[in-house]
Amino acid sequence: MRLLISGGGTGGHIYPALALIEAIKQKEPDSEILYVGTHKGLESRIVPSAGVPLKTIKIQGFKRSLSLENFKTVYLFLKSVHDCKKIIRDFKPDVVVGTGGYVCGAVVYAAARMKIPTFVHEQNSVAGVTNKFLSRFVDKVGICFEDARKDFPASKVVFTGNPRAQQVAGMKDTGRLEKEYKLRKDLPTVMIFGGSRGAEGINAAALKAIPQFAKKEYQVLFVTGKVHYDKIMAKDEAKNLPDNVRIEPYIADMPAILPEVASIVGRAGATSLAEITALGIPTILIPSPYVTNDHQTKNAMSLVNKDAALMIKEKDLTADILVKNVDKIMNDSDKRLQMGKNAKEAGIPDAANQVIKVLEDIMHK
């Protein structure tokens, strides 16, 4: 398979693309892959470090308010479509995939106009602007949440799940909690994590909760995010930590540690939920209030409604409420087991293979 793939801006668009690439390479080692992104986006660093060839185009997203910048955006879009057609002619892909972010708009649109099989993947419960626009031109649209179905032409929608799930589904306990973080193997661990950059609201509540956590029969691994770590460690609550609480700035290769944790407190981003459900981990979700269309709340509700997660709105989050919810899961092993089972049933552990099947179908239609 010759695959041209594009997605950028945030890790939520990039990591599913890389997971799909990995699955294709496992299935067809001779496959040729080309990733198209922007030189400013996260993809310019993440994609080459994953060993995937990258070409960049110049493009920018629309401003949501009326702005003269939008005229520049239209100009750059038209120019980048022209540039993408040249990239496509040179690479000669069998299929073109977009995983979201404005960069994939020009790439997938150009491919569709050139009559090349095209597919877009929507990770969230509320469709992004770019994927909504592209859905009129592509052959198929992959979704991860039933709520997203209504945003696309019904005949094009396929429920595939998130390829990232397949990447983590087979991961095993490697004892990192004990070896690297000096936590006990005989006590269950809850990980509190606000995303790669951390989250001030979650951090503030977790910090204030430390005196209560000190009295519990479970352990807490509190990951602050690098930018917040020094500030957190300067607080009184972070001094003389109890034996059952560890504070870390970040965790390298986070998914690899997930099989060792009994439960997670964190955001409700699409990639996180794909990983959590693939492994069947009960969670307390605190949706980010700063995302478009409040899509993280809708993501979270898909698991809350299946009794696979609890949810706290950030505006309601306090140390007491955090501890009360963590206790509900960590002090009740039967509940934890059932929530984990429900989470696993909500996941699609072979999501990358599901996407590959759709790609093969549209290539051979």
From Swiss-Prot:
Q: In which pathway does it act?
A: Cell wall biogenesis; peptidoglycan biosynthesis
Q: Report the catalytic activity.
A: Mur2Ac(oyl-L-Ala-gamma-D-Glu-L-Lys-D-Ala-D-Ala)-di-trans,octa-cis-undecaprenyl diphosphate + UDP-N-acetyl-alpha-D-glucosamine = beta-D-GlcNAc-(1->4)-Mur2Ac(oyl-L-Ala-gamma-D-Glu-L-Lys-D-Ala-D-Ala)-di-trans,octa-cis-undecaprenyl diphosphate + UDP + H(+)
Q: From which organism does this entry originate?
A: Ligilactobacillus salivarius (strain UCC118)
> Recorded E.C. number(s)?
2.4.1.227
Q: What is its main location?
A: membrane
Q: What does this protein do?
A: Cell wall formation. Catalyzes the transfer of a GlcNAc subunit on undecaprenyl-pyrophosphoryl-MurNAc-pentapeptide (lipid intermediate I) to form undecaprenyl-pyrophosphoryl-MurNAc-(pentapeptide)GlcNAc (lipid intermediate II).
Q: Which GO terms describe its molecular function?
A: undecaprenyldiphospho-muramoylpentapeptide beta-N-acetylglucosaminyltransferase activity
The record describes its membrane topology as: Peripheral membrane protein
Q: What class of enzyme is it?
A: transferase
Listed GO CC annotations: plasma membrane
Q: What residues does UDP-N-acetyl-alpha-D-glucosamine bind to? A: 10-12, 124, 196, 251, 296
Q: What is this protein called?
A: UDP-N-acetylglucosamine--N-acetylmuramyl-(pentapeptide) pyrophosphoryl-undecaprenol N-acetylglucosamine transferase
Matching NCBIfam families = murG
Per the record, the similarity remark reads: Belongs to the glycosyltransferase 28 family. MurG subfamily.
What compartments host this protein?
Answer: Cell membrane
Disulphide bridges, residue numbers: none
Q: Sorted alphabetically, which keywords does the UniProt record give? A: Cell cycle, Cell division, Cell membrane, Cell shape, Cell wall biogenesis/degradation, Glycosyltransferase, Membrane, Peptidoglycan synthesis, Transferase
Matching entries from Gene3D superfamilies are given as: Glycogen Phosphorylase B
A Gene Ontology biological process noted in the UniProt record is: cell wall organization
